[in-house]
């Protein structure tokens, strides 16, 4: 399942944006990923940094489909657009 949301992603001084945040089907061992734990605002906008570049795994609170409660998920951020 992918949610259409805005993600601002900074790596190596470049900023990327993506409209997709894909929830993984299972919980991964978080220590295996060279990432930062990210806490998201209710509108699911996040800022992430990954020194290695490319996609990353971020952990995020988000509101799903208008529900009043948030779910804690591991999410895959897929880069698809570079912005200035």
Curated annotation (Swiss-Prot):
Record's subcellular location: Host cytoplasm; Host nucleus
Keywords recorded for this protein, A-Z: Disulfide bond, Host cytoplasm, Host nucleus
Disulfide topology: 22-40
Keyword Endoplasmic reticulum: no
PROSITE patterns the record matches: SARS_ORF8_IG
Secretion signal, residue range per the UniProt entry: none
Domain of life: Viruses
GO cellular component: host cell cytoplasm; host cell nucleus
Transmembrane segments: none
A Pfam family annotated for this UniProt entry: bCoV_NS8
Chief place of localization: host cell
Residue ranges occupied by any SARS ORF8 Ig-like domain in the UniProt entry: 1-82
Xref: InterPro entries: ORF8_betacoronavirus (IPR022722), SARS_ORF8_IG (IPR046444)
Function in brief: Non-structural protein which is dispensable for virus replication in cell culture.
Protein name: ORF8b protein
Naturally occurring in which organism (per UniProt): Severe acute respiratory syndrome coronavirus
């Amino acid at each position: 399942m992918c949610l259409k949301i805005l993600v601002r992603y900074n790596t190596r001084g470049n900023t990327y944006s993506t409209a997709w945040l894909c929830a993984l089907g299972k919980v991964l061992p978080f220590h295996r990923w060279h990432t930062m734990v990210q806490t998201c605002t209710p509108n699911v906008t996040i800022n992430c940094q990954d020194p290695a570049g490319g996609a990353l795994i971020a952990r995020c609170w988000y509101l799903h489909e208008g529900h009043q409660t948030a779910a804690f998920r591991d999410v895959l951020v897929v880069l698809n657009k570079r912005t200035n």
